[in-house]
Amino acid sequence: MIQTETRLKVADNSGAREILTIKVLGGSGRKFANIGDVIVASVKQATPGGAVKKGDVVKAVIVRTKSGARRKDGSYIKFDENAAVIIREDKTPRGTRIFGPVARELRDGGFMKIVSLAPEVL
């Protein structure tokens, strides 16, 4: 579960390396975000020459969480880190590559471009 002030690794080549969650989108007073949810975040670390700079406020979708997610068949999926992909308003990624595996739950949220760019979908 991701909440306000949570730091996440960025799993794309948009130029950001680490982001800090400002707000969880999707309902008033929503506290936690899980895999496939959209957040508003601030860039805390960035690579030089990237499209995204330190201090930029961006939207991102969560692709991996340590707490994991429960699937309809009763199984759980967990990852070793919390990670997100920076997106545009039309749910397409800002970067051109995705690093590491992503969860199958992104397909249900309409993030097909992220699923197709990912090297592995679990």
Swiss-Prot record:
GO terms for molecular function: large ribosomal subunit rRNA binding; structural constituent of ribosome. It comes from the Bacteria. GO terms for biological process: translation. Keywords: Ribonucleoprotein, Ribosomal protein, RNA-binding, rRNA-binding. The keyword Ribosomal protein applies. InterPro entries: Ribosomal_uL14 (IPR000218), Ribosomal_uL14_bac-type (IPR005745), Ribosomal_uL14_CS (IPR019972), Ribosomal_uL14_sf (IPR036853). One of its GO terms (cellular component) is cytosolic large ribosomal subunit. The keyword rRNA-binding applies. Belongs to the universal ribosomal protein uL14 family. Part of the 50S ribosomal subunit. Forms a cluster with proteins L3 and L19. In the 70S ribosome, L14 and L19 interact and together make contacts with the 16S rRNA in bridges B5 and B8. HAMAP family: Ribosomal_uL14. NCBIfam families: rplN_bact. Binds to 23S rRNA. Forms part of two intersubunit bridges in the 70S ribosome. This is Large ribosomal subunit protein uL14. It comes from Streptococcus sanguinis (strain SK36).
